Regions:
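RNase H-like two-metal-ion nuclease catalytic core shared by retroviral integrases
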Residues: 113-115, 120-123, 138-164, 171-179
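Glycine-centered loop/turn motifs
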Residues: 42-46, 167-168
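Basic, flexible linker segments flanking DNA-binding modules
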Residues: 1-41
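Mobile genetic element proteins and their domesticated derivatives, centered on retroelements
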Residues: 51, 67, 73, 92, ...
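Short, surface-exposed basic-aromatic patches at helix termini and helix-loop junctions that form
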Residues: 125-135
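Active-site beta-loop-alpha junctions of metal-dependent nucleic acid enzymes
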Residues: 56, 60, 77-102
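Long, charged, low-complexity intrinsically disordered regions
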Residues: 30-33, 44, 48, 52-53, ...
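Short conserved beta-strand segments at catalytic cores or DNA/RNA-binding microdomains
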Residues: 40, 53-54, 59-76, 80
Length: 179
């Protein structure tokens, strides 16, 4: 009977197969050490860092996808319904449709991310929604637990936290609010 249980056991939520694949360690994709040296100097525009900012922890909450340009510190923030690789690639597809395929390739030459499950599907991040064989960008993975390798992005995330502190729900936010 339900009233006789001690209440300390909760049923774990099942992880879908396609999401489980991205929980495995990243053995594919390019690391930050494969990135061209000129990206480190910040002399050229078009090299971005990408991360997710979460709202209420443990809730089915929207997330903020934050893209930060390394030289100009320009930022693009997209509201995502969840923390999946599919929603990240859909957000990049939306941006690509908005600015055009050629402009996207010029604007987003490289994107550096952490090793989160949401960025593991590097093929969908690099590949255009048009199905073109030419990659729309190149993705590089930072080393695990090395947030300083994406310092621009981490600083912008800190600024976002001034307005949306940890523990704040993003449920009431709209895309227009975050732009």
């Amino acid at each position: 009977r339900k009233d006789l249980t001690c209440g300390k056991y909760k049923k774990k939520e099942k992880i879908k197969k396609e999401e489980r694949e991205f929980l495995k360690p990243n053995k594919e994709g390019k690391t930050i050490h494969d990135r061209p040296e000129e990206i480190k100097t910040r002399e050229e525009i078009g090299h971005w860092e990408m991360d997710l900012v979460e709202g209420l922890k443990g809730q089915k909450e929207p997330y903020l996808l934050v893209l930060s340009e390394r030289k100009t510190r320009k930022e693009i923030i997209e509201l995502l319904p969840n923390k999946t690789a599919k929603s990240v690639s859909k957000a990049l597809d939306r941006i690509e449709k908005e600015i055009g395929v050629v402009k996207f390739r010029e604007t987003f030459k490289t994107i550096t991310t952490d090793n989160g499950a949401e960025f593991r599907n590097w093929k969908s991040i690099e590949q255009s929604y048009t199905g073109s064989k030419k990659a729309r960008t190149s993705q590089y993975f930072a080393d695990a637990y090395s947030s300083w390798q994406r310092g621009t992005n981490e600083n912008i995330n800190k600024m976002i936290r001034r307005f949306l502190p940890k523990g704040t729900s993003f449920k009431g936010l709209k895309q227009e609010d975050v732009k």
